[in-house]
Curated annotation (Swiss-Prot):
Protein name (database record): Valine--tRNA ligase
The EC number(s) this enzyme carries: 6.1.1.9
Chain coiled-coil ranges: 765-822
Species name: Mesomycoplasma hyopneumoniae (strain 7448) (Mycoplasma hyopneumoniae)
UniProt KW Lipoprotein keyword: no
Length: 822
């Protein structure tokens, strides 16, 4: 073995070996199962640090359960990522001078599949470097043939239960991507903008009402003013009419409980391009008219400003209204504005025909399950509350997207008739042009990836899956949808437990991103430090629901631990191996391994990986390296030490798979993944070894404190206890000491009194130091006495200063007397 840990030597082709030997091909289940369906990364790019963290957690848990004797399944997959992939492909085509509109739909889809294949090869290469134990015989793609059958079947089953409908409703519209998006794909951000205070004159009156709005560009779609029915200031105006400032038409004043009396003047203009406004219009049977088109420009409803960008038009409209006396004032405010998560464009609210999932019944089913004993267990628990609150206020889900790349909606139209089925009903029937939201397809992955609705073999063995590991940021996007989809189709929960981890941030707490330039490429880290180092740096800093502040120091710490394990293994491997029974030290070490294993088993159940990391670090650096290896240096035989090393490698394997696999193969000629988690004896007579260590520590501390050379034999004895000759021999060898009955210098430790014969060299040094101290004290006393006999000082100095000098003189004399007596 090399003198230093070489991760490239250790990790080269090791995952390839695991795959060839089929260590992680899920067997026909005969033992207790442990299964995880891995969150599918998008085929839009490379894996980032967050993907690596997630994959490492899953892989470590699967390896742990395999060593515990479980039948394991870690199923890999990738997501077609509808909008994101289509944008990437369009950008790629644009570089070649090709527009999407230049291609037929089928041609564009082929381009998307070609893109997917290239990206998937890159992702698989990255998985290989990470060392993830996927069962690639069962890998899935959210747009493969089986997935298309499953998604269509799911859609039809929802339709048959009247849980899917097509309706013209206010939806979130991405003007850049030209598609509808769901509510949770809208991110609210604080934006500085202008608040316009508009004058609405009462019919046939010089009196006016002031209405505050940040969206002056929607004024032409105003159909009413609304006040809260509890607002006594305006209640007498309900039913009256006001003059529209722009069109000069009359619009009515209504009362609605959704109006906030605290916002602006407490009067709200009811117009298109707001979901709340649309709801009020429907409730009061008011006609709605859009004034903004699909591209974010003003339409024919505003002839004077038609074609103007919605935001540019704000100033134009404000100037016109000010000129005509309908603008009271303008203020600058900061308010939340909805942005598309996909394009970062400000979302527009438009009324459009779309496909929706009715969420009331599905939400009630999920909340009911959360109230049952069979509910999914969330780690940390507070995310269950978050999920419950979200479902209590949920809206219907917009599932149609105006894209080409994705699952086609299984609906066929002919004239005014339509049919919901997978295959075409016949000639003249045209399939709906839209595709389904990506989360609609990934929302059934918990059971569809296992074969539903065509093959139930894996479902019988591994469903519900044991665990889902994912980031808390997609709790509502993905976890929630798998939950209600599984309850609807499978009549049971999709997984037993959900472990939600946080985000990876830089060392000052900022989210890692391209725009900030603080992102780290996991493949570059692996190239420099190795996969085990990255795994350890991420996993051993993980706690459920918590973010990680990542920095290079964490990698250095992890690499040092790997190097320490390497050095321990090399030392033990070089020892003689003739048979020998375990001695007291071996049994003590075995008990330390027992404690480590117990701590890992205890904390892995709670997913407290940071605690596991601390336990492993303390064990390797403390018990194994500083203690056990030091203790066995008193002998040349490593027979039992090798047995203990083998057990440690198996215990550490889930967290350091490459290194432990290499060492097991190199030293023991065994495959670590063919082993079982070792049974370890608990040794109860540990105190004898702890006593030896206590004596060694204190003798070493004494030697270090007084800088006594190792060439000088330290003579000592234990006053209040007896040690065997074998135990004394160990102490002597590890402290360069010798037992000698004496009572010259007694050191009291936690449990003992150690008498040390002070070496002559130290006595001479000590005497020299004391003589110097005496000379110093005498000179200080002389100085103090001169000051205190100085008349000028005594007459001019403050009383406090004189008293201070006298006190100082007394202490100096006491100290001098002590040294002279000594």
């Amino acid at each position: 073995m090399k003198n230093k840990y070489d991760f490239k030597l250790v990790e080269e082709k090791r995952n390839e070996k695991w795959q060839k030997k089929g260590f992680f091909i899920a067997p026909k289940q005969t033992k207790k199962p442990f299964s995880i369906i891995s969150p599918p990364p998008n085929v839009t790019g490379q894996l980032h640090l967050g993907h690596s963290w997630n994959a490492f957690i899953q892989d470590s848990l699967v390896r742990y359960h395999k060593l515990q004797g479980f039948d394991v399944l870690l199923l890999p997959s990738v997501d077609h990522a509808g909008i994101a992939t289509q944008v990437k492909v369009e950008e790629d085509l644009a570089k070649k001078g090709i527009k999407k509109s230049d291609l037929k739909r089928e041609e564009f889809i082929k381009k998307c599949y070609h893109w997917k294949e290239k990206q998937y090869l890159k992702i698989k290469e990255q998985w290989d470097k990470l060392g993830i134990c996927y069962d690639f015989s069962k890998e899935r793609f959210t747009l493969d043939q089986d997935a298309q059958i499953a998604v269509s079947d799911f859609f039809i089953k929802l339709w048959e239960k009247n849980l899917i409908y097509r309706g013209q409703k206010a939806i979130n519209w991405d003007i850049k991507l030209q598609t509808a998006i769901s509510n949770i794909e809208v991110i609210n951000k604080p934006v500085e903008q202008k608040m316009y205070y508009l004058k609405y004159f009462l019919e046939n009156s010089n009196e006016f009402l002031t209405v505050a709005t940040t969206r002056i560009e929607t004024i032409s779609s105003d159909v009413a003013l609304a006040i809260n029915p509890k607002d006594k200031r305006y209640l007498h105006l309900v039913g009256k009419k006001v003059v529209h400032p722009l069109t000069k038409k009359l619009i009515i004043i209504i009362a609605d409980s959704n109006v906030s009396s605290d916002f602006g003047s407490g009067i709200m203009k009811v117009s298109a391009h707001s979901i709340l406004d649309f709801e009020i219009m429907e409730k009061h049977n008011l006609e709605s008219k859009d004034c903004i088109d699909n591209y974010g420009n003003l339409n024919h409803e505003v002839p004077e400003f038609q074609g103007q960008n919605r935001f540019f038009a704000r100033d134009l409209i404000a100037k016109k209204l000010e000129k005509e006396g309908f603008l009271a004032k303008i203020e600058t405010v900061i308010s939340n504005v909805g942005f598309s998560q996909r394009s970062d464009e400000i979302v527009e609210i438009l009324k459009k025909p779309q496909w929706f999932v009715k969420m009331d019944e599905l939400a009630k089913s999920l909340i009911s399950h959360l109230n049952s004993k069979d509910k999914i267990k969330f780690y940390p628990k507070n995310f269950e509350k978050n999920l419950r609150k979200w479902f209590e206020k949920i809206h219907d889900w917009t599932i149609s997207r105006q894209l080409w790349w994705g699952h086609r909606i299984p609906v066929w139209c002919k004239n005014d008739e339509f049919k919901v089925q997978i295959d075409s009903p016949g000639q003249g029937w045209i399939q709906d042009e839209d595709v389904l939201d990506t989360w609609f397809s990934s929302g059934i992955s918990a059971f569809a990836f296992l074969g539903w609705p065509q093959n139930f073999d894996l479902i019988k063995s591994y469903f519900p899956t044991s665990l889902l590991v994912t980031g808390w940021d997609i709790l509502f996007f993905w976890v929630a949808r798998m939950y209600f989809s599984s309850l609807f189709i499978m009549k049971q929960k999709p997984f037993e437990k959900v472990l939600l981890h946080g985000l990876i941030r830089d060392e000052i707490g900022r989210k890692m991103s391209k725009s900030l330039g603080n992102g780290l490429d996991p493949m570059e880290i692996i190239e420099k430090y190795g996969s085990d180092t990255l795994r350890q740096a991420l996993i051993f800093n993980s706690s459920p629901g918590k973010d990680i502040k990542f920095n290079i120091e964490k990698l250095n710490t992890a690499w040092n631990l790997n190097n320490k394990i390497w050095n321990i293994a090399k030392y033990i491997a070089d020892l003689d191996t003739f048979f020998a029974k375990p001695d007291l030290i071996d049994l003590w070490m075995e008990n330390k391994i027992y404690i480590l294993k117990r701590q890992i088993v205890k904390n892995i159940k709670k997913y407290n990986f940071s605690v596991i990391g601390t336990e492993i670090n303390n064990f390797i650096y403390g018990d194994f390296s500083s203690r056990y290896i030091e203790l066995i240096k008193t002998r040349k035989n490593g027979f039992y030490a090798r047995k203990l090393l083998r057990k440690v490698l198996i215990i550490l394997h889930p967290f350091l798979p490459f290194l432990t696999d290499f060492l097991m193969e190199k030293i023991f000629k065994m495959e670590i993944l063919e082993q079982k988690m070792p049974r370890i004896r608990q040794f109860k007579e540990n105190q004898k070894v702890e006593n030896i260590l206590e004596i060694i520590d204190n003798l070493r501390t004494y030697r270090e404190k007084f800088q006594i050379s190792k060439k000088i034999i330290l003579e000592y004895c234990i006053i209040n206890d007896k040690f065997s000759n074998a135990e004394i021999d160990i102490i002597n060898k590890l402290t360069f000491g010798k037992w000698l009955e004496n009572k010259e210098l007694v050191i009291k430790t936690k449990n003992f009194e150690i008498a040390i014969k002070v070496p002559e060299e130290l006595k001479k040094e000590q005497k020299g130091r004391e003589l110097k101290e005496i000379q110093f004290l005498k000179s200080e006393i002389l100085r103090a006495e001169k000051i205190l006999t100085n008349k000028g000082f005594l007459e001019k100095a403050p009383r406090e200063k004189i008293d201070l000098e006298r006190t100082k003189l007394e202490k100096l004399k006491e100290k001098l007397a002590f040294y002279e007596k000594k």
